[in-house]
Amino acid sequence: MGDVIVLYAAPGMGHIVSMVELGKLIVHRYGPHKFSITILYTCGSVVDITSISAYIRRISHSHPSISFRQFPRVTNKITRNISGAAIMFDFIRQNDPHVRRALQEISKSVAVRAFIIDLFCTSALPIGKEFNIPTYYFYTSGAAALAAFLYFPKIDEQTTESFQDLRDTVFEFPGWKSPLKAIHMVEPVLDRNDPAYSDMIYFCSQLPKSNGIIVNTFEELESSNVLQAIAGGLCVPDGPTPPVYYVGPLIDEEKELSNDAAAAEEEDCLSWLDKQPSRSVLFLCFGSRGSFPAVQLKEIANGLEASGQRFLWVVKKPPVEEKTKQVHGVDDFDLKGVLPEGFLERTADRGMVVKSWAPQVVVLKKESVGGFVTHCGWNSVLEAVVAGVPMIAWPLYAEQHMNRNVLVTDMEIAIGVEQRDEEDGFVSGEEVERRVRELMESEGGRVLRERCKKIGEMALAALGETGSSTRNFVNFVSSIT
């Protein structure tokens, strides 16, 4: 039995999946004789523990060298009217005693070679240092977003107003080709008076104080200007930038265990795709939590119908509050009731609508899939990149507006939809039709598809024996041994 590397995941399926993929990479490259992996995760009011527990059971069964340690349940004590992000950040801080206890207990029986934390788990950084454990960040988005976060303490100095009030004022980030509107900043920093704002400033200011930053991307995907800005210290002008290791793309390609009903629907979906012409189907899916109110679902349906294109569309139950863009769980609902009357019947010969979930990694790799409408969550972006599928970028929350900017302007692997710059981010049916036709019918769409195919090949090469991500990963391991 080798030494252990402890990973600490932020709440949320996307964060845990990314951490697990990093753990799988370490075990795959070096085996349990050198390193075992222990993943710490939280339990409480902000966590969808049911779906996470099912996922963890699957990973524990298939990867016995990866163990999980669930913290005792924590309940938020905050009752003030603050944002969901502020509530989550407070929830994570309340787990600090559990982090300290876990590291203390693990260290008694085995050497902890490294402690790797999510950005949102920054309050654990001094705990790792307290135990003299080399402490690294695992940044689960791309290099451009990392550049922005590293630079954000300097942006904070440029204004005393809330970004949500500055709206169309633009801000420049080192290495970025185009500036970002204030209203499109990452959600937790929009309101300067919300506690989440100061939390984010703190998180970003602590990034350079780590032993290094591991990033789930690969060099060939990112703009050379962004990579140079980070490496050259432009993002942290007042101090040293720690080593940055680009080790991706890390994605979960294992088949999920489904119940009988889900398995049957999955089989129908994949069988339908197999019958469609090459690169003819547009896949629409907005992540594990992305959801739309009924009025927006109807606009999407109208746009798809008017476009005349083949499509596979994953529809989630509309949120209770119209302006909310996230749902938790997969509650049943009346599909016909949230779509235009007769839509399913009129498009039955060229479209398929499934409720709540589809095997996204498998779908994107199908020969018939020629485009992907995505919320720009980084895991989904990487899955499309690896599959060589171009995207229509439709951001909903978190850092997704940042990702949209970069995908469209810097990486040139996506087309952006025009959204209303209000809280609901509304997109008209006419805009849906326009962008779908642009991607699936135009010469520009064909060029984009060819470019994405080449980048997909680069993604695989990056993970090869002599690839850039493999080289960077070896450098990371060398830093802890």
From Swiss-Prot:
Pfam families, per database record: UDPGT
Its keywords, alphabetically, are: Glycosyltransferase, Transferase
Superkingdom as given in the UniProt entry:
Eukaryota
Say if the entry is tagged with keyword Glycosyltransferase.
yes
Q: Which residues bind UDP-alpha-D-glucose?
A: 288, 357-358, 375-383, 397-400
Q: Which GO terms describe its molecular function?
A: UDP-glucosyltransferase activity
Question: What Enzyme Commission number(s) does the record list for this chain?
Answer: 2.4.1.-
What is the top EC class of this enzyme, as a single word? transferase
* Keyword presence, Repeat: no
Q: So what family is this one in?
A: Belongs to the UDP-glycosyltransferase family.
What is the role of the protein in this entry? Glycosyltransferase that may possess chalcone and dihydrochalcone 2'-O-glucosyltransferase activity.
Q: Write down what this protein is called.
A: UDP-glycosyltransferase 88F4
Originating gene: UGT88F4
